[in-house]
């Protein structure tokens, strides 16, 4: 059966589609409390903006377009994410088919994406903008390899579309087209692709896609870059100078190993001696891919040396190293050895990973009393809503964080949910509110309902004065009853008379 599934991209895609349907069903069955990225999407889906803060807006635009038609729900948050992630796998398979002669190897390369922790597990757990980045990276690889093999106006435009989408999905995507451009230069047979007239409309298309956000960026550079720079520099952990450079280079090495180790070990274990014999094989396409990965990683070395980055995360390497599995299978195919035994050993890895990932996604929520680590999805928002609205319903909700705001938006799909000073000054909706307004926040820790000075100050600046601060504490969902999560809240009357 597994051999039939991996016979072509079509059969493998059907198998993958069934897997993603199971992921959707599992998310719908689990508590409808949103994790941080989901909550941000829920909150941001009220607005169509050129920029939203530290993350580029592509995923937000997609989510806004869907929510504006269907309304907010758990389905609307889960289904688009899984479709985009499925698209990542599909275009990766199509990219593999451009460089691999064997249709079976291309299908297996596509399915093998699940062995990359950042793709198989982390993208399903909590990430959204990274899912868009993965999709754009696969789309770019497909257009890039198609252009090298058989250039058409369509393949060039595909590169332009992927580049535009990638740049407004995650800023680190910019490394990929730069690395691809440099990687092609030494290959005489493909160098002409870089001076082809069809590259111009591709560039124009990419610019048009990026333009709305690019016009927003200069006036909002601080809000767009500060959180990322803070995570990259980790100043509280690394002193300036050589110690910071050393920590940054070490974190880069650890991130690379964390990204590539598992699939390499699995493929090496399956193909055994054939894998090590294949490492010496080469071809023009192999050399291009090698240069792409090396140039991308050198760009991160430059970030460490010249931007002071000391904390490189694995997911930042997605556009640099996603091509790894195509590279490994291309090495095996180019070695011109019998791969049948290795393929038979490797095929079962994919369904095993599917079962393991679904089990992790389930057990991390329902088994927290055994694990001891409580997730945001275990916060009992439905219980809070039942308690808070037993006697009255809000006409407006003012939240202290995006986590609170997004979850309240899901619970009250017809009620505006706002955060002070986003997207503009104060809370203008308060002045027009006729009826009870719910102000709700959380503290620094799970059992701390203390209102933060910053949020309290923003409320005062917005003309909202809290008559009484109250606390609501409920046990975590699926917990042992001993651990709880607390929120603070206050009811005020709207400003409209």
UniProtKB/Swiss-Prot annotation:
Membrane topology recorded in Swiss-Prot or TrEMBL: Multi-pass membrane protein
UniProt subcellular location: Cell inner membrane
Transmembrane segments: 14-34, 74-94, 104-124, 127-147, 165-185, 199-219, 249-269, 292-312, 321-341, 348-368
Top-tier EC class: transferase
Pfam family, one: PMT_2
A GO biological-process term: lipopolysaccharide core region biosynthetic process
Pathway assigned to this chain's UniProt record: Bacterial outer membrane biogenesis; LPS core biosynthesis
Statement: the UniProt record of this protein carries the keyword Cell inner membrane: yes
Keyword terms, alphabetized: Cell inner membrane, Cell membrane, Glycosyltransferase, Lipopolysaccharide biosynthesis, Membrane, Transferase, Transmembrane, Transmembrane helix
GO cellular component: plasma membrane
Disrupted gene: phenotype observed: Cells lacking this gene produce a normal lipid A structure with GalA at the 4'-position but a modified LPS core structure as this gene deletion results in elimination of the addition of GalA to the Man residue, but does not affect the addition of GalA to the 4- and 5-positions of outer Kdo. The mutant cells are also more resistant to the polycationic antimicrobial peptide PmxB.
InterPro entries the UniProt entry points to: LipidA_mod_glycosyltrf_83 (IPR050297), RgtA/B/C-like (IPR038731)
Keyword Transferase: yes
Single GO term (MF): pentosyltransferase activity
Enzyme Commission number, as recorded: 2.4.1.-
Domain of life: Bacteria
Function: Involved in the modification of the lipopolysaccharide (LPS) inner core. Catalyzes the transfer of a galacturonic acid (GalA) residue to the 4-position of mannose residue of the LPS inner core, using dodecaprenyl phosphate-GalA as the donor substrate. Seems to act after the other GalA transferases RgtA and RgtB.
Family assignment from sequence similarity: Belongs to the glycosyltransferase 83 family.
Name this protein carries in UniProt: Lipopolysaccharide core galacturonosyltransferase RgtC
Lineage: Bacteria, Pseudomonadati, Pseudomonadota, Alphaproteobacteria, Hyphomicrobiales
